[in-house]
Amino acid sequence: MTGGKSGGKASGSKNAQSRSSKAGLAFPVGRVHRLLRKGNYAQRVGAGAPVYLAAVLEYLAAEILELAGNAARDNKKTRIIPRHLQLAIRNDEELNKLLGHVTIAQGGVLPNIHQNLLPKKTPKAGKGSQEL
């Protein structure tokens, strides 16, 4: 029985490989594809669209987490909290533009004191250096 209908997997077939691993991504391409189909965004979804979207989402997540990790390290902490996410997003010009209308719970506000509220700087008299 060397025909094609012997049942089971063929002996020469390769092991199954996920689309995420084929694309070198950590985000799930199959899940993104399913969500695109079920979300009624379009009647049909191409094969490359979920791969591209998963790559974009992975990049954004990595960018935000890197900046938040830097903010946590600046505050001498080892755990990222919502405050670090808020500081990372609001201090980055492009991320702030992208997520400008997003409210982060427990994020707080950026430290900012208006220039008029700061004490006036008075010039201090030098010790004889200006008398020439």
Curated annotation (Swiss-Prot):
GO terms for biological process: DNA repair; heterochromatin formation. It is found in: Nucleus; Chromosome. The modification Phosphoserine is found at S129. Phosphorylated to form H2AS128ph (gamma-H2A) in response to DNA double-strand breaks (DSBs) generated by exogenous genotoxic agents and by stalled replication forks. Phosphorylation is dependent on the DNA damage checkpoint kinases mec1/ATR and tel1/ATM, spreads on either side of a detected DSB site and may mark the surrounding chromatin for recruitment of proteins required for DNA damage signaling and repair. Gamma-H2A is removed from the DNA prior to the strand invasion-primer extension step of the repair process and subsequently dephosphorylated. GO terms for cellular component: nucleosome; nucleus. One of its GO terms (molecular function) is structural constituent of chromatin. Residues 1-10 have a biased composition (Gly residues). Residues 1-24 are annotated as: Disordered. It comes from the Eukaryota. The modification N5-methylglutamine is found at Q106. CDD domains: HFD_H2A. The record marks K120 as: Not ubiquitinated. Belongs to the histone H2A family. The nucleosome is a histone octamer containing two molecules each of H2A, H2B, H3 and H4 assembled in one H3-H4 heterotetramer and two H2A-H2B heterodimers. The octamer wraps approximately 147 bp of DNA. The [ST]-Q motif constitutes a recognition sequence for kinases from the PI3/PI4-kinase family. In contrast to vertebrates and insects, its C-terminus is not monoubiquitinated. This is Histone H2A. The lineage of its organism: Eukaryota, Fungi, Dikarya, Ascomycota, Pezizomycotina. The gene is htaA.
